[in-house]
Amino acid sequence: MLDRRIALRSLAQPRFAVLRYPAGQPPHGSANESPGANVEAIDLLIDARWVIPVNPAGRVLEHHSVAVRDGRILAVQPAAAAHAAYHAAERVELPRHALIPGLVNLHTHASMALMRGLADDMALMQWLQDRIWPAEARHVSPQFVYDGTLLACAEMLRGGITCFNEMYFYPGDAARAALDMGMRAALGLIAIDLPTAYASDAEDYLAKGLDLRDTLREQPLLSFCMAPHAPYTVSDRTFSRLLTLAEELDLPVHMHVHETQDEIARSVAQHGMRPLERLRRLGLVGPNLIAVHAIHLNKEEIALLVQNGCSVAHCPSSNLKFANGFAPVTRMLADGVNVGLGTDGSASNNRLDLFQEMRLAALLAKGLSGDARALPAQRALSMATLDGARALRLDHAIGSIESGKLADLAAVEFNVPDMLPCYDPISHLVYTAGRENVSHVWVAGRLLVENRELKNRPKNDLENLIVLWQNRLSMETKA
């Protein structure tokens, strides 16, 4: 391991190189040279200026290579040692890049990408009741969800996001889009005590969700969460049924919690207690809970989350845009709550950009605490990767660059004027880099973004879909 405070040297090297070899031809020496007896055949070798594994925290490996076989990381080694040890079918040279784990978006509503900018500068409940719910009633369909999720996946992949935790209607169509794009998704099996075009009542939501899980449970890119929308839209009876299913199936429970002061006031008026206390009494506060937003928490509620091993999905941009308040992230982290980062949906953010969320989370923590050391860059990066994976209970497979884990990876280019000079790559990733600096993305070892271009879906297809939906939804902007 080398010191993180490294200055960029000459910029004369190429931005990247991809070396592909015909079957049976070794990637070293002449075409007639055979690999040595101790050389191991692999699918992919990625050489990077810096490999940032995230675990251990703060480590930066200079001039290292990541060896990949069958979609998994086989080894992380100094480049010279890796070149001697492995016979790679493909080698990618990234001499001016940092290789990081693929980012994990811990909370989003992917297909709402089609509603980006539809209704801005409004408080949450006005936004929902006056604009979003009516628009959803008129437009949301399986095709809406499929097309919107395609658009969201394209945006997320180009920004280094390789896994997203989804909560929306028609999750099967979201799954289809994610699989078509080659992206990893945790599908929320949504439950709400309101009829929609997707389901007539809570039992219908749950039945459809369970059928979907049974159908897709063997898909390696998919996992599942129970996804009750929020305490103010789900009844005690539905929560009890959902808890039983979550325990039987061992699934996380992904839900909006304590997002606004109004939500809390209405819960006290209706139930005689704050939402988190109600959830505790119903048995839902436990290690499976992913509490989204979690803005208005007192000390006792933070302690409750800690004691029960809960996770929080922190969505700073969405929280600010709705003027909902400031989540006590510094206190949660200090006390031991696992906190990941989410974008929320495009209709409320309006970007699916975890680089933005990392930077904003770190800056807000410093400004609100009055402590410049609060939420350092390495912790922000962990929140966007390993901590999000941990909340989804996928940290055994993704979230860090370690032998045995899936090769969900993103490369960030530093060889551009706005990224120079660089003394500390991790600091640069959080305070300087943007998603526009992401050059390559792999999911399970499969290259999905190369030199900033999507490999899997023609750009003009997405543009045509966007135009069609924009024409249909344009009437909503006049509401």
Predicted features by range, described:
Residues 2-64, 68-74, 79, 85, ...:
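Active-site microenvironment of metallo-dependent hydrolases
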Residues 98, 116-182, 205-218, 467-478:
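Alpha-helical scaffold segments that flank or form the walls of functional sites
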Residues 103-111, 254-256, 293, 344:
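Histidine-centered divalent metal-coordination motifs
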Residues 114-147, 184-203, 261-288, 308-311, ...:
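Active-site gating loops and adjacent loop-to-helix segments of metal-dependent hydrolytic enzymes
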Residues 173-295, 300:
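Metal-coordinating catalytic core of metallo-dependent amide/deamination hydrolases
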Residues 281-288, 330-416, 432-433:
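His/Asp/Glu-enriched, well-ordered alpha-helical/loop segment
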Residues 321-323:
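Helical hairpin unit composed of two closely spaced alpha helices linked by a short loop
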